[in-house]
C-alpha cells in the first residue's frame, strides 16, 4: 500500500511538473537584420524634393542626433541653425539668382525645376564651427548623424557645401547675419531635408581600397 501511494504521488508530481510553462530560448533576429546598417546602406543623396513641409518635431529629432555625434575632446564647437521658412529660402534664392546673371550658373537657375538653391529642400540645417584642429571633422560627423536620422524617419537629405560660398558675398551677407552665429564661428556646410521626390539608384562602392595589415 505504501509503495502504491509513493508511486501515485510521483506520478502526480511528474504530470504537474510537465504542465508548467517551460523556459524557451530567446528568439534571435537574423544576423543580417540590423536597422542601423540598413539605414547606412540605403541612404542616398536626394536632389529632388516634394514641397511638403517637414514637421518640426522630426527636425528636432534629426538635429538632436547631430548634436550627439562624436567630436574632439567633446568640445562641441559647433552651432546649428534650422531654416524651414519658405519666405527665407525664396528670398535667398532670388538674391542668388540675381548674383549669377551673366555667369555659367545662370542657365542652371533659370531651369523650371529650380525652386531654391538648396536642391529645393523645404528645410535646411546650417552647421557652423569654431575653426580648430578637429572641428571640420566634428561637423562632418554631425552631418552624417543627421542624414542617417533623416533616413530612419523616411526623409531624404543631402549635404552641401556649394551654397556656403554665397554667404561670403556682399549679396549673401544679410542672410549670413540673419543666422545670428556667435562671434568666431564660421558657416561650414548645410544639410537639406525633405520628402524625397526621387529614388536614385546606388552608386557602386569600391571595396578594393580596403586592406587589412598583418
Each language-model region and where it sits:
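Bacterial N-terminal signal peptides
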Residues: 7-16
Amino acid at each position: 500500500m505504501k509503495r502504491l501511494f509513493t508511486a501515485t504521488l510521483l506520478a502526480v508530481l511528474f504530470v504537474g511538473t510537465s504542465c508548467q510553462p517551460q523556459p524557451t530560448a530567446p528568439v534571435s533576429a537574423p544576423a543580417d537584420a540590423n536597422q542601423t546598417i540598413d539605414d547606412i546602406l540605403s541612404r542616398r543623396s536626394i536632389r529632388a524634393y516634394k514641397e511638403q513641409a517637414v514637421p518640426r518635431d522630426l527636425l528636432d529629432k534629426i538635429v538632436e542626433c547631430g548634436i550627439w555625434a562624436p567630436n574632439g575632446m567633446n568640445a562641441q564647437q559647433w552651432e546649428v541653425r534650422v531654416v524651414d521658412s519658405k519666405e527665407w529660402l525664396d528670398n535667398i534664392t532670388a538674391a542668388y539668382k540675381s548674383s549669377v546673371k551673366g555667369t555659367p550658373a545662370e542657365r542652371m537657375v533659370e531651369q523650371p525645376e529650380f525652386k531654391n538653391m538648396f536642391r529645393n529642400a523645404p528645410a535646411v540645417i546650417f552647421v557652423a564651427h569654431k575653426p580648430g584642429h578637429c572641428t571640420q571633422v566634428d561637423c562632418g560627423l554631425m552631418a552624417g548623424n543627421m542624414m542617417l536620422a533623416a533616413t530612419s524617419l523616411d526623409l531624404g537629405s543631402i549635404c552641401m557645401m556649394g551654397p556656403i560660398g554665397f554667404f561670403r558675398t556682399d549679396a549673401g551677407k544679410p542672410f549670413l547675419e540673419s543666422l545670428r552665429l556667435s562671434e568666431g564661428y564660421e558657416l561650414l556646410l548645410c544639410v537639406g531635408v525633405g520628402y524625397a521626390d526621387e529614388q536614385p539608384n546606388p552608386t557602386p562602392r569600391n571595396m578594393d581600397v580596403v586592406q587589412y595589415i598583418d
